[in-house]
Structures are given as structure tokens and as C-alpha cells.
Amino acid sequence: MKITTSRIETESIGDKGIFETLFREYLSGFSVELDPSVIAQLFALPYFHGFISFVDNKPAGFAVCFESFSTYRAQRVMNIHDFMVSDSFRGKGVGKALLNGIEQYCRDNDYLKITLEVSNDNVAAKNLYSSLDYEDYRVVLKGQQHWQKYLN
């Protein structure tokens, strides 16, 4: 079994089709319909970075990432916003390979860090992230909280 990870080429019709198929599978877990314009809008964002993992050349998972910037450290930051491994490929190392591929891209391009969000009840994901040395912000930045305000 060979696992590979590649960065999505936003101009590639093939990558767009593969991503759309995986993204529909991802959204089905949330009972959400895919707005037909989402992928085009996503691929048009200059700060979008997408990654796809393959097992023996079959699409197996994806990550939607967004680039931001640390004003404190004057370096780019990569945020993993959506992360999914297809049901049929879970438990086979795809998630680890996908995260390692993102990390390698970030190291090669001088990013400061990688951030992500995970639900408290997603034990499998938290175990994966911990195994690769990700840690809760509160461990690193005691006394800080992340807040949000939905606008619609």
C-alpha cells in the first residue's frame, strides 16, 4: 500500500473533481448540501492551500488549509480548517501521511506553525494530532482563549 500526498493545483480540472467528490463525502457527515459555488470560491482565494492524499492512486482524504500571518513572529501560519479521511481508508495511516505532507510543505516554505481546531469528542483525531506533537493552545499559551462571533 502506497500513500502519497499532493498539494491541490487549483487550475487542475482533475484535482477539482477529486476534491469535490471527497468534499461531498465530508459534508454528508454533517447533513449539509454542497453549495455549487463553494469550490470555485475556495479555489479562487489566494490564501487557500488544499492537499489530497491517495492510497495506491485512489483519493483517500483531503485538507482545506488557509494561510495567515503572525505579526508577532513575522512568519506565515497554516491553519487546517477542514480535514477528512474517507471511511474506507481510515486506520491505514492516511491521516498521518496527510498531516506529514502538510508539515513538509510548511517546513519547505518557512511557515512558523500549523494550527487546527478539533471537537472535544473527536478522540481519534485528537490521538492522531497528539501522536504528531500537536497540542492544545492552552498548553502553550496559558491564559489565552480563542473567541469568535458568527456574522450570519
Label for each model-derived stretch:
Residues 2-3, 11, 112-152:
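C-terminal "cap" of GNAT-fold acetyltransferases
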Residues 85, 91-104, 127-131:
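Conserved acetyl-CoA-binding loop-helix of GNAT-fold acetyltransferases
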Residues 3-75, 81, 138-142:
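Acetyl-CoA-dependent GNAT
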Residues 81, 86, 119:
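Residue-level recognition of the GNAT/N-acetyltransferase active site
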